[in-house]
């Protein structure tokens, strides 16, 4: 959430910063609302101060007067009652204005970082690094073809169970999924992350705090009888884990890692990636999440990206890092590095992790602060996939495919999978 004070005092700067996203944001209405809200806040504070002074006068008058019905006391009490009525009326106006401001401000995205490349869409993203040697062979199979030949997942029967864009992992497919989850969790916990296993169902306030609501309500699955949603990413419950808290600065930085199932409608993706493991309604992911001192978030962003990179290197998967331009940034992000893995069958890199610095955007929405230099300030939050499991499996199947139809398991994963090769059972 953007700072209301900044919107109220410098609306032009706010519009200029938001315009870097490639859209026009007219905040004149919300600016007007924040000015009215501040005016009412001042009036309420002034009346409350006067009311306290009046209460003291009434107390003094009662103590020195034997007659509780004296004209002076009656006049003071009448004035006190007028104050209470006026304060109550203003507080009701304040409540209505608060809701109007929230309805507007919660739909405004984060400011893009000054270091993010200026651009309109994904075509303006900048490649900043590549690693590994991408396989380039016309005869290489897609991961869904490999999966079908090895009988490790089934999409057809999953459609019968649920609908399209679901998959059932079978035998060695389920085994490989478990191996990847445990491998990634072990890697990250050894690197100083504390593992959490959060709920898969989250309430609206949690989604609002991380930035999914209200803007992206059509992209998530909602329970019909409760204020609960299937979590689209562990970023949501990890943000909410410290909602409305004042965190001891001695605890910073807080680094969490969490495995969770993720659920997304994938609205707007009709016809894209209809086969395989790339774009599903349900998928597993290992998420990295930081809470840190605002002065340390730039370095933290480099570190969380490096921690995600480490998984690619250990699995020997060719990848690249892309600096996301201002027009392609996620709603809550100020700066994002996408980590994309090479998929030989597609002859391109595909996003498998987004490492984002959200500055104080999520912490402000979730009221997560720390007392630093004697001031209560909003912390900075960072998140990154470490990694998406299904897409990692797809990359292993394609990059590790052998001429005999088997798949070579990366050396670092062998202790978890229990075999050097994935073969048809």
From Swiss-Prot:
> Which of UniProt's keywords are assigned here?
Aminoacyl-tRNA synthetase, ATP-binding, Cytoplasm, Ligase, Nucleotide-binding, Protein biosynthesis
Q: What is its EC number?
A: 6.1.1.11
Q: One GO CC annotation, please?
A: cytoplasm
Please list the residues that bind L-serine: 233-235, 287, 385
Sites where the protein binds ATP: 264-266, 351-354
Pfam families linked to this entry: Seryl_tRNA_N, tRNA-synt_2b
Instruction: State any GO BP term from the record.
Output: selenocysteine biosynthetic process
Compartments annotated for it: namely: Cytoplasm
PROSITE patterns xref list? AA_TRNA_LIGASE_II
* Reactions that this protein is recorded to catalyse: tRNA(Ser) + L-serine + ATP = L-seryl-tRNA(Ser) + AMP + diphosphate + H(+); tRNA(Sec) + L-serine + ATP = L-seryl-tRNA(Sec) + AMP + diphosphate + H(+)
Question: Which family, according to the similarity comment?
Answer: Belongs to the class-II aminoacyl-tRNA synthetase family. Type-1 seryl-tRNA synthetase subfamily.
* NCBIfam families, A to Z: serS (TIGR00414)
Quaternary arrangement and interactors, per the entry? Homodimer. The tRNA molecule binds across the dimer.
Q: What does this protein do?
A: Catalyzes the attachment of serine to tRNA(Ser). Is also able to aminoacylate tRNA(Sec) with serine, to form the misacylated tRNA L-seryl-tRNA(Sec), which will be further converted into selenocysteinyl-tRNA(Sec).
Protein name, please? Serine--tRNA ligase
Per the UniProt record, the source organism is Prochlorococcus marinus (strain MIT 9215)
Q: Which gene encodes it?
A: serS
